[in-house]
Amino acid sequence: MREIELASWKDVSRRVSSIAKSLEIIYETKLTVNFCEIPLERVFPTEDFLENDKLALVFRKIVEENYDVPITVVKSGGDYFVLDGHHRAFIRKKLMYETIKANVLEFPEGKTYRAIPRRRLEDLRMKDVSPIDDLILKAWQRILFVVEHYEAIHDVPFYLSREKIQLKDLVPTQPHVGKAQIDAIKKVLVPIACVRSGRKCYILDGHARSLRAKELGLDFVEAMVLLSTARIDFGIVKTAEAMGLRKLEDIKII
C-alpha cells in the first residue's frame, strides 16, 4: 500500500499560496484569498475521479477525528470550484454536512476563472489507484463501495447517516459467516453499512462486526445508514425475507 500524506492545518497556508501564485501567473492578475465556510451545494469538482485509498483514509479521519482541514476553491459567480480538497469535500457531502471550511480565491472585477462545466460532487467515482493492505482501512473502503454499488443500481445519489443501531433491530442479508472472520475482530472499530426499512436495518456490510459486537455483550453498533432523497424499495429486504433472515441469531456461523 502506498504512503498517503493528507493535507494538514500546518501546511494549508503553503498549499494555498502555491495555488494562488500559479493562477496569478497564468491569468496575469492578482487574486485575493478569504477564509470562510461555504455551502457544499455550491461546490463543484474540477477533477474527474477520486483515489480509492485516499478517499477511504479521508472518510475514516473525518468520522473518527473530525478531520476538517480547509479545502481550496476558486470563486466564479456564486459557485466554488475545488482546486485542492476533492476527497474532503466529497466525504463531507456524503455525510450530509451543509458547509465546509475553505480558502476562497477570488479574481478582481473584469477577470474570471476559465469556463468550466458544473458537475455534482456526488457524481465523482472512485478509481482503483492502489491496493489497500490495512484491514481496517479496507473495511472503510467497502462502505464506500456499497454506496457506489447502490447508486449504480438505483441511479440516484446516496448519503450516509452516522447512527448507533440496536443489535435487536439488525437484520442480516447473508445466511452464513465464517467463525474465523468473527474471531479475527478483537474490537469493533469500523461502522457497519445498512439500509433502513420500517423499524429494521438490513446489513449490507459488517455481518461479522455485528456478530462480534453481540459476542462482546454490546447492545448497539455504530452504523452508516444509506439514505436517498428518492423513495426506494430495496430488493435486499425481500431477499432476506425469502431466506428466512429476521435477526442476527438467524445467521449460521461456520
What role is predicted for each listed range?
Residues 1-83, 87-204, 208-227, 233-236:
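Short, charged/polar connector segments at secondary-structure boundaries
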Residues 136-140, 249-254:
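Extended, charge-rich low-complexity interaction segments
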Residues 240-245:
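Long, compositionally biased intrinsically disordered regions enriched in Pro/Ser/Gly
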